[in-house]
């Protein structure tokens, strides 16, 4: 007899509903706590996550739950063993445009999914590596709101960072 898996409904900020296995949903500590507090009867509203981003988050969680199951249920397998296929998949997963990457980062933070948060933060850090402050501002479309005097003061106080 086939085992039926408990399903959870997740509702995005733009009204989309996603039916997800509980094992996948609890990759999010935020959702896990809502389930533990019995707050799932009518679905779990996620007001800070759009449907498009929630679909990507679910894809990430599903992939990692499946990979952990293949590794014998060891959730720490990613760091303790060489799982090149998953690492490659993760690297490809964050090859998205800037707005999507930042939305994924915000969703990972809001949903408290540590693996996804680490992955998205690393992707942003990798984009910053080797760039000057001016190049980073241009790359991330950040306005420089320092006066030349303020910028010189910051550079002087933090000389070690500019060497």
Swiss-Prot record:
Which pathway does the database say it acts in?
Answer: Protein modification; protein ubiquitination
Where do the record's region annotations for Interaction with the F-box domain of F-box proteins lie? 105-163
Q: Name one GO biological process term.
A: response to jasmonic acid
Q: Which cysteines are joined by disulfide bonds?
A: none
Does the record's keyword annotation contain Calcium? no
Q: Does the keyword Transferase apply?
A: no
Q: Which CDD domains match?
A: BTB_POZ_SKP1
Q: Name one GO cellular component term.
A: SCF ubiquitin ligase complex
> Which organs or tissues contain this protein?
Highly expressed in siliques.
Q: InterPro entries under this entry?
A: SKP1 (IPR016897), SKP1-like (IPR001232), SKP1-like_dim_sf (IPR036296), SKP1/BTB/POZ_sf (IPR011333), Skp1_comp_dimer (IPR016072), Skp1_comp_POZ (IPR016073)
Per its UniProt entry, which superkingdom is the organism in? Eukaryota
Where is this chain's protein located in or outside the cell? Nucleus
Record's keyword terms, sorted: Nucleus, Ubl conjugation pathway
One Pfam annotation, family name?
A: Skp1
Function of the protein: Involved in ubiquitination and subsequent proteasomal degradation of target proteins. Together with CUL1, RBX1 and a F-box protein, it forms a SCF E3 ubiquitin ligase complex. The functional specificity of this complex depends on the type of F-box protein. In the SCF complex, it serves as an adapter that links the F-box protein to CUL1.
Q: How does it assemble?
A: Part of a SCF (SKP1-cullin-F-box) protein ligase complex. Interacts with ADO3/FKF1 and At3g61590.
Family, as annotated? Belongs to the SKP1 family.
Q: What is this protein called?
A: SKP1-like protein 3
List the lineage, top down: Eukaryota, Viridiplantae, Streptophyta, Embryophyta, Tracheophyta
